[in-house]
């Protein structure tokens, strides 16, 4: 019997309350050519009993005699995987029935893609809390990675050959942001994509990582952002990283200090030399131009015509032409300063 096309990799640590649902969601996939590697990371609850209760031959069960933690267990799973692709699965989440099929088909049709995610919905106690819809293409994902993770770990499907060719593993120095950090490295050697459909469900509960280790996760996420800025050739402070996130989310402070800081940062980004490893010049400059315009246009009612003048004084304003009608509205907003 040949190797399976996909390895589904699921670490388990004391996941008893949710484990059956997680396992069933994989075994009931429309795509069936997979091996299901389940690694019990030293659980002290009934997790092992639940796993061993399944007779499906696709399940390959491994047990860590001691709790190695998530990153070491995932890296062990990378080495054990025999599939052309490796799909991640968390032991408290749910994969919707066509998830593997759709990701496999996308990866097969697009050999340049080495990591594929999907949209997901979050839920708690049976109630849907909302959906997370990430951008579809490599450039969008990489640009947004400068201020937030933009591909969900649990939904990820890797091209195994890319991982092995470049020696890519999760980095234990970035605990609780290990996915974000790996994305920063894998995106420099292959393309990323997100399927524009909800194919995964993320469960929220009292023991989830973001609640228990939020401070560590935040600190290590800052380190990843700093690393990404460095890769495109920019040295930034934590304050500048926060400023860029505010600009991206249209959370503007109506002050000269905010505008001046944004000007320094965005013009610094315009002068960057290393961004072409992630996206084209036209994409990068268009994104900066849109941020530059939105920043000034939306702060004009508070800053008056000075915002309009500052907008046109920067080389950023020439990256994307502004229609005459829009310029007229821009001036009018400035004249109607509150």
Task: Label the model's feature ranges.
Residues 1-27:
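N-proximal low-complexity "stem/linker" segments adjacent to membrane-targeting elements
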């Amino acid at each position: 019997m040949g190797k399976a096309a996909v390895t589904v990799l699921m670490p388990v640590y004391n996941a008893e309350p949710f484990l059956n649902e997680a396992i069933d969601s994989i075994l009931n996939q429309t795509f069936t050519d997979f091996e299901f590697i389940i690694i019990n990371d030293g659980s002290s609850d009934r997790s092992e009993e639940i796993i061993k209760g399944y007779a499906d031959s696709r399940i390959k069960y491994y047990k860590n005699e001691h709790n190695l933690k998530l990153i070491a267990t995932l890296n062990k799973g990378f080495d054990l995987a025999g599939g052309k692709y490796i799909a991640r699965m968390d032991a408290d989440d749910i994969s919707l029935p066509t998830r593997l099929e759709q990701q496999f088909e996308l990866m097969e049709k697009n050999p340049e893609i080495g990591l594929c995610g999907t949209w997901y919905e979050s839920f708690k106690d049976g109630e849907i809390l909302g959906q997370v819809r990430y951008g579809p293409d490599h450039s969008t994902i990489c640009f947004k990675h400068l201020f937030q993770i933009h591909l969900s770990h649990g939904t990820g499907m890797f091209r195994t050959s890319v991982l092995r060719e470049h020696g890519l593993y999760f980095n234990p120095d970035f605990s609780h942001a290990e996915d974000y950090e790996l994305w920063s490295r894998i995106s420099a050697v292959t393309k990323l994509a997100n399927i524009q459909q909800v194919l995964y469900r993320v469960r929220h509960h009292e023991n989830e990582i973001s609640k228990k280790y939020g401070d560590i996760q935040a600190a290590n996420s800052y380190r990843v952002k700093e690393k990404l800025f460095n890769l495109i050739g920019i040295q930034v402070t934590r304050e500048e990283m926060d400023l860029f996130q505010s600009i991206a989310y249209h959370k503007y402070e109506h002050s000269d200090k905010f505008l001046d800081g944004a000007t320094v940062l965005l013009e610094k980004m315009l002068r960057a030399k290393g961004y072409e490893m992630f996206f084209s010049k036209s994409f990068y400059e268009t994104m900066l131009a849109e941020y530059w315009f939105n920043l000034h246009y939306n702060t004009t009612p508070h800053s008056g015509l000075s915002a309009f003048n500052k907008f046109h004084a920067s080389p950023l304003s020439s990256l994307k032409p502004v229609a005459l009608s829009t310029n007229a509205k821009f001036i009018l907003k400035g004249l109607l300063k509150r």
